[in-house]
């Protein structure tokens, strides 16, 4: 009864071996012309005019300078860019590559000669070409005509931690950065030097590898980080506790101590750290002695508690018993967090103002507290995770309280849109609920003619980067201090334009109907807004429930 071994099988003979697949060569970079339609003023108070002409050229008269967006959002320090500007100007001009008007990263040349090609290395964030008069203290530039700008991008870096086939990075959490050192409720943390700051974020998708982007965009000096750790938050969202068994060191270029240079955004190394969707992660940072006290980059409307203690407590389980503990509801130097996901994963950016930022979700006079995660974006993320077809869709909240297209609190919406949409990983959708802060007690409807071109630029930028745009008509505000007949008229013009085919949006998300009083659609329902009239404090869940999830299914 001893089993007989199966006879050996003979390998087939003369079967040709397939040649190994050849990898397609990476095409050499070529120069191409920038789209000039996004040209804008460098400074908000510039009274001159910039005109995009029908032939695609752009002209300016009596302006302080001009910003032209670059079309590569993946430029990093060390990359080489070649630029040729064609046109003419009334005066000698100088050129910069810049983050925005106030943060120049690399000077192209001074002066800049039209038709000449300049090659230079990126030394900071690169979003725009900035053109202005050569002399610092000169009067406005009388005239400038740009017929074409040619660019060639030469990537000069090695990809860190390459991913296996079928995988990619997708941002799972993000926030809109702004200067915060003078903001109530946040400024009590300044100075940050030689303190530990524990910040809590809630991820919206799952992954087993993790990385952070850290921003010092508004700082004029470097941020010194002595140590940074991440860990799962403990059982209660309103406490500083961490699960110490998950405590993990964060490094940059392999170093536990590092700096975030002035005006720059850096990326951490890949962290082996598994997260589950809707889980809270604690980011604990011990700052060194050099941290800016002005131009502090952060976000004042976290709606989540941040903890600060003296000394290095990054691995301490609970900060509640540490002497000198402070709390606030803001974030510092965090831009976003990403996880590795399958290739079909994607992110949606919620771009807006205080309504998107969740104003009122921590309103003490209504019995509300921080750490509730009840912004409309939070409810939206929960719905996406409850739907099998959208579990791989993350939510990034890019709302800033008091923000407007033309200014308001924080960086103007028209200036930050590019950063807040394109600098995240894996963005496939954008929801725009924005503009109410531009409608404060208007006397007539002429503001519509200023706002419409800015919306058009936002929509065009998204489409140029294969991002679907869903417009959310501006919510009613009839019982707020903003209301006037002119303001209501502009709201209706914007909303009707969004709903028309002329706008070019890919769909409408009707938050307006979800929160409007059916008996008086100019007002938000009383049970949602209470005495505010503008913010739907208790209507954020109704807003999220109004979103058709099929719009986010592939």
Regions picked out by a protein language model, each given a short descriptive name:
Residues 231, 324-330, 334-338, 345-349, ...:
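Conserved SGNH/GDSL esterase-like catalytic core that processes O-acyl groups on lipids
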Residues 440, 475-554:
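Catalytic His-Asp segment of secreted/periplasmic serine-dependent ester chemistry enzymes
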Residues 56, 60-74, 79-125:
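Extracellular ligand-binding interfaces
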Residues 131-140, 284-290:
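Short beta-strand-plus-loop segments that form exposed binding edges in beta-rich domains
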Residues 3-8, 12, 18-32, 154-351, ...:
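N-terminal secretory targeting modules
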Residues 136-151:
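Extracellular carbohydrate recognition
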Residues 74-82, 125-128, 205-211, 343-346:
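Extended extracellular/luminal ectodomain segments enriched in beta-structured repeat modules
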Residues 48-63, 179-185:
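Short carbohydrate-recognition loop motifs
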């Amino acid at each position: 009864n001893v089993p007989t071994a199966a006879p050996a099988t003979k390998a087939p003979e003369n079967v040709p071996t397939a040649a190994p697949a050849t990898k397609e060569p990476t095409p050499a970079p070529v120069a191409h012309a920038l789209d000039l339609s996004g040209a804008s003023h460098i400074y908000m108070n510039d009274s001159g005019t910039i005109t995009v002409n029908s032939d695609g050229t752009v002209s300016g008269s009596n302006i302080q300078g001009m910003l032209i967006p670059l079309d590569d959002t993946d430029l990093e320090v060390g990359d080489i860019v070649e630029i040729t500007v064609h046109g003419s100007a009334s005066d000698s001009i100088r050129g910069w590559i810049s983050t925005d008007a106030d943060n120049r990263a690399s000077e192209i040349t001074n002066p800049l000669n039209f038709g000449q090609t300049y090659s230079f290395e990126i030394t900071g964030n690169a979003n725009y070409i900035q053109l202005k008069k050569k002399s610092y203290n000169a009067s406005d530039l009388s005239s400038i005509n740009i017929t074409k700008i040619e660019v060639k991008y030469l990537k000069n870096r090695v990809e860190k931690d390459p991913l296996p086939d079928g995988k990619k990075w997708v941002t799972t959490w993000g926030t809109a950065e702004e200067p915060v050192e003078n903001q109530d409720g946040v400024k009590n943390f300044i100075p940050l030097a030689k303190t530990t700051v524990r910040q809590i974020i809630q991820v919206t998708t799952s992954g087993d590898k993790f990385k952070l982007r850290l921003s010092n965009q508004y700082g004029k000096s470097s941020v010194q980080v002595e140590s940074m750790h991440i860990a799962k938050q403990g059982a209660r969202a309103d406490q500083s506790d961490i699960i110490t068994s998950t405590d993990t060191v964060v490094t940059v270029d392999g170093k536990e101590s590092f700096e975030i240079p002035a005006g720059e955004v850096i990326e951490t190394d890949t962290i082996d750290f598994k997260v589950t969707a809707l889980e809270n992660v604690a980011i604990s940072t011990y700052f060194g002695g050099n941290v800016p006290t002005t131009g502090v980059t952060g976000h004042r409307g976290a709606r989540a508690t941040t903890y600060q203690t003296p000394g290095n407590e990054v691995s301490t389980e609970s900060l509640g018993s540490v002497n000198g503990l402070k709390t606030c509801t803001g974030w510092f130097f965090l831009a976003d967090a990403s996880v590795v996901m399958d290739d079909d994963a994607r992110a949606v950016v919620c771009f807006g103002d205080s309504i998107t930022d969740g104003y009122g979700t921590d309103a003490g006079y209504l019995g509300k507290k921080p750490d509730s995660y009840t912004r409309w974006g939070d409810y939206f993320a929960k719905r996406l995770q409850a739907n099998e077809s959208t579990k791989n869709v993350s939510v990034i909240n890019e709302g800033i309280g008091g923000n407007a297209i033309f200014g308001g609190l924080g960086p103007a919406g028209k200036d930050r849109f590019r950063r807040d949409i394109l600098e995240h990983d894996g963005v496939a959708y954008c929801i725009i609920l924005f503009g109410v802060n531009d409608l404060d007690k208007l006397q007539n409807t002429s503001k519509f003619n200023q706002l419409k071109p800015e919306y058009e630029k936002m929509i065009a930028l998204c489409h140029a980067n294969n991002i679907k745009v869903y417009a959310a008509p501006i919510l009613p505000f009839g019982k707020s201090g903003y209301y006037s007949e002119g303001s209501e008229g502009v709201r209706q013009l914007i909303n009707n334009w969004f709903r028309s085919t002329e706008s070019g949006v890919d769909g409408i998300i009707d938050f307006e109907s979800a929160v409007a009083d059916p008996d008086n659609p100019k007002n938000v329902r009383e049970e949602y807004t209470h005495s505010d009239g503008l913010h739907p404090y208790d209507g954020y869940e109704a807003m999220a429930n109004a979103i058709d999830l099929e719009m986010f299914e592939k």
